[in-house]
């Protein structure tokens, strides 16, 4: 009789059950201490970089976010990749023509850290219109991890969101909505250089407050009121409530600016003007200068 093996594997990714021990105060205190060790320099554009500008970082960050969204990466991948990028730029001068290679490499490493099935080098090269080769990406990977001293388990705002939600006496339905909106705010903050100066815990807390404010959620015990929630989260992360409010206001201003920019991009007149400009300037199909990247 022919023996056959029965394969019981499924395509869905297996996930661990939530562990309450990982959400206790001792773990949160350790995370608040650890976030200081993986913070990038807030002045690397002035002190380290000679060619790369904040506007170039914005372009590459937006491209990285779109790649992560299209590939349905885990929510943690993009903020972690941006942490790698900012820390590398804090240490090493980078030519503007190599910034997209660095961004792809950061996604490559972050995907390995956070995903069961990580992004491949070949797939990331395709997203650059094959302007880089897999061999270049692997070489940059070695340089990246060495410059970061293999300290790759950096804290990101996503790591704190679950801790905050676990301490909020709210219904699970509300928590799911808040979590989704807060994750969107975290990704948006990662694209803006102004938030480098804020620790991940503050970005996470500000995102949760902004999510609750934007959703206009109400609770029977009034826990979700603006001032009460702000005071509560400021005590959790041990910061001044005014600093947390300032961060939350920055997040809301960034959202408003992004929505305004999206509306302008959808304006037919603006699109026609952009097409006329593209006709006047003959650009290469694969931009070698990051400022020429058309997101």
UniProtKB/Swiss-Prot annotation:
Residues 28-152 form the Cyclin N-terminal domain. Changing residue 286 to A: Reduced interaction with the DCX(AMBRA1) complex, and subsequent ubiquitination and degradation by the proteasome. Abolished ubiquitination and subsequent degradation following DNA damage. It is linked to A chromosomal aberration involving CCND1 may be a cause of B-lymphocytic malignancy, particularly mantle-cell lymphoma (MCL). Translocation t(11;14)(q13;q32) with immunoglobulin gene regions. Activation of CCND1 may be oncogenic by directly altering progression through the cell cycle. Its main location: nucleus. Interacts with either CDK4 or CDK6 protein kinase to form a serine/threonine kinase holoenzyme complex. The cyclin subunit imparts substrate specificity to the complex. Component of the ternary complex CCND1/CDK4/CDKN1B required for nuclear translocation and modulation of CDK4-mediated kinase activity. Interacts directly with CDKN1B. Can form similar complexes with either CDKN1A or CDKN2A. Interacts with UHRF2; the interaction ubiquitinates CCND1 and appears to occur independently of phosphorylation. Interacts with USP2. It holds the Pfam family Cyclin_C. It is found in: Nucleus; Cytoplasm; Nucleus membrane. GO terms for molecular function: cyclin-dependent protein serine/threonine kinase activator activity; cyclin-dependent protein serine/threonine kinase regulator activity; enzyme binding; histone deacetylase binding; proline-rich region binding; protein kinase activity; protein kinase binding; protein serine/threonine kinase activator activity. SUPFAM superfamilies: Cyclin-like. The gene is CCND1. Regulatory component of the cyclin D1-CDK4 (DC) complex that phosphorylates and inhibits members of the retinoblastoma (RB) protein family including RB1 and regulates the cell-cycle during G(1)/S transition. Phosphorylation of RB1 allows dissociation of the transcription factor E2F from the RB/E2F complex and the subsequent transcription of E2F target genes which are responsible for the progression through the G(1) phase. Hypophosphorylates RB1 in early G(1) phase. Cyclin D-CDK4 complexes are major integrators of various mitogenenic and antimitogenic signals. Transmembrane segments: none annotated. Residues 262-295 are annotated as: Disordered. This is G1/S-specific cyclin-D1. GO terms for biological process: cell division; DNA damage response; endoplasmic reticulum unfolded protein response; fat cell differentiation; G1/S transition of mitotic cell cycle; lactation; Leydig cell differentiation; liver regeneration. InterPro entries: Cyclin, Cyclin-like_dom, Cyclin-like_sf, Cyclin_C-dom, Cyclin_N, Cyclins_cyclin-box.
């Amino acid at each position: 009789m022919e023996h056959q093996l029965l394969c019981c594997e499924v395509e869905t990714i297996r996930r661990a059950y939530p562990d309450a021990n990982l959400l206790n105060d001792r773990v949160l205190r350790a995370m608040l201490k650890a976030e200081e060790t993986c913070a990038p320099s807030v002045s690397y554009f002035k002190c380290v970089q000679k060619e790369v500008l904040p506007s170039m970082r914005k372009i590459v960050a937006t491209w990285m976010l779109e790649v992560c969204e299209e590939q349905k990466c885990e929510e943690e991948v993009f903020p972690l990749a941006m942490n790698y990028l900012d820390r590398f730029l804090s240490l090493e001068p980078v030519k503007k023509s190599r910034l997209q290679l660095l961004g792809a490499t950061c996604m490559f490493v972050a995907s390995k850290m956070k995903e069961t099935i990580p992004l491949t080098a070949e797939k990331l090269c395709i997203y650059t219109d094959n302007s880089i080769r897999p061999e270049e990406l692997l070489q940059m990977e070695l340089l990246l991890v060495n410059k970061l001293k293999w300290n790759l388990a950096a804290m990101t705002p996503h790591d704190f969101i679950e801790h905050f939600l676990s301490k909020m006496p709210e219904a699970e339905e509300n928590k799911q909505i808040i979590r989704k909106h807060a994750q969107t705010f975290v990704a948006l903050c990662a694209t803006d250089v102004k938030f480098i100066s804020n620790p991940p815990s503050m970005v996470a807390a500000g995102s949760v407050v902004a999510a609750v404010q934007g959703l206009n959620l109400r609770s029977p015990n009034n826990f979700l009121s603006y001032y009460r929630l702000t005071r509560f989260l400021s005590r959790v992360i041990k910061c001044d409530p005014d600093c947390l409010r300032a961060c939350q206001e920055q997040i809301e201003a960034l959202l408003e600016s992004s929505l305004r920019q999206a509306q302008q991009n959808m304006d037919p007149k603006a699109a026609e003007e952009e097409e006329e400009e593209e006709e006047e300037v003959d650009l290469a199909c694969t931009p070698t200068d990051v400022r020429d990247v058309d997101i």
